[in-house]
Amino acid sequence: MAVHPVLAQVTRRIQERSHATRTDYLEQVDAMAARPPQVRSMGCANVAHAFAALPGADKIRIVEEKGPNIGIVTAYNDVLSAHAPFARYPDILKDEARRHGATAQVAGGVPAMCDGVTQGMPGMELSLFSRDAIAMSTAIALTHDTFDAALMLGVCDKIVPGLLIGALHFGHLPTVFVPAGPMTSGLSNHEKAKVRELAAQGLVGRQELLAAENAAYHEQGTCTFYGTANSNQMLLEAMGLHVPGTSFINPAEAERELLTREAMRTVLSITHSKRFAPIGRVVDERCIVNAMVALLATGGSTNHLIHWVAVARAAGIIIDWDDFEQLSAVVPLLARIYPNGSADVNQFQKAGGPGYVIAQLLQAGLMHDDVLTVREDGMAAFGRIPHVENGSLLWNDAGASGDDGVLRPASAPFSPTGGLKLLKGNMGRSVIKVSAVPEDRHHLRAPAWVFDSQDELQAAFKSGALEQACQSNGHNGVVCVVRWQGPQANGMPELHKLTPPLAVLQGKGYKMALVTDGRMSGASGKVPAAIHLSPEALAGGPLAKVRSGDLMTLNASTGQLQAEVSEAEWSSRELAQMPDALKRSNGRGLGRELFAGFRRNALSAEEGACTWLLN
């Protein structure tokens, strides 16, 4: 199947835009790859330090037999349910390496925080920046420079992008990502959301709410909604950086350990065969476009409009939100997974999962098939589904959807477009995810109410003032503007705690929307939200010009976000300043002082909110 012309056009434009930076990056990759193995050129003391802790037989394999040594970078901790299974992975991987004449070492650990724990709490202000801290930690782990290849153990929101950014700075190393899978299904995401809305209204108490949350999040594995963590896994499949079909096998399933061992065999196959497939070559412009398409086709997390900009830049590739929007116009929505539907990721996997999606996109010419992957048989391998037969892993073609209420073919999708829209106007540039928003909510016009924090909005809801404003302003609704939430202001926290109160008011028939320079969770959906507004208010963005009472238009169909203020008045308005109380409290306590440099150096959301790339 020929590549879709829009896909080809966007890819060419990215290649042209990135020519200088990508050329420079690949020169560095090739220079590093051309060096002799560092173990052979290191001093004896260096070598002794590097392998002092290894069993004698492993030392012989590395030093005398010159076998491959694989560096493992792990995000293990047992606070994150998704990462708890990684506790035993290093032993499994080391055992598999020895079976093939190789060795493996845990090169280092990286921090991994759970956004579910920190939602609405001060710790959430470190969430986005933890991505770059993880990238730096990955670099520290690999900088011992004694490894022939690497395995990355991570799953969740900022962890995978951080590991990927870090790995791309060691682009000469063959690298495979190793996930742990989702938890089995508990209380449905729909039922959980209903209880949250009841709690927001005060109709159920803490005991009932806690019982519902415990029933939803109940064991090891990722959360079962299709948020940022599970979107990460879909994108890694589309980039060819996983063992095919490994994303959504539950931690306790028989396939899981076999797939983990296969990850070691896969990375060793690259080192043994001398097939030049280091991660810096695998992740090229076509690979990045494939990831963008997979995100759109599955209704994935809006967080990736920040993260994958940063990931691409780590490989010398420059993408922007125009690229996403143009792809979204031609990429069909093939999946309905909560919050874009009622199914969870286990039902998605049962219906065909990533293998089905990728096979459909390849057949429709909506993914590049002529790309390097960690598998010798290329992108076609990722359109297949693994299963166990007589104790061995086998892969079958994806075939037909197992449930057309969850997965549909590209010829008969849920929607002809991917459900992400770029919004532009006198407010700047932002994005909106419309795949989960009812169609009658894609366009609204209502007065703004400006809030300086999410706590202010919560207080207005709880007091009844927000509903009263909806009733009395003649527009039956409010556009809630929450500013000072960008990367430079406070680290750009997710504002997921605002979803239940806004959803309650929308459920009562009011026209509600959120406009912010902050982020929303990958699990947020049914309330229209213009997010990631750039430039942010603290950087002098137009968001700082909005005043409560300004009439606002949000139109996802036409891509418009506009404050209906005359051009003369708008241009003459002074920018609001961050309140002194926020200045005093932002970045203080719970270690936030340590990230002052991150806030100071952070680029805009559309530039990936990078703290390590200074323009």
Specify the residue positions occupied by each region the protein language model found.
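Acidic/charged coordination and interface sites in well-structured regions
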Residues: 88
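A short, small-residue-rich loop immediately preceding and capping a beta-strand
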Residues: 142-163, 174-178
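N-terminal small/polar loop signature for handling phosphorylated ligands or for N-terminal nucleophile
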Residues: 107-145
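Catalytic or ion-coupling anion/metal-binding cores of large enzyme and transporter domains
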Residues: 1-68, 74-78, 82, 91-110, ...
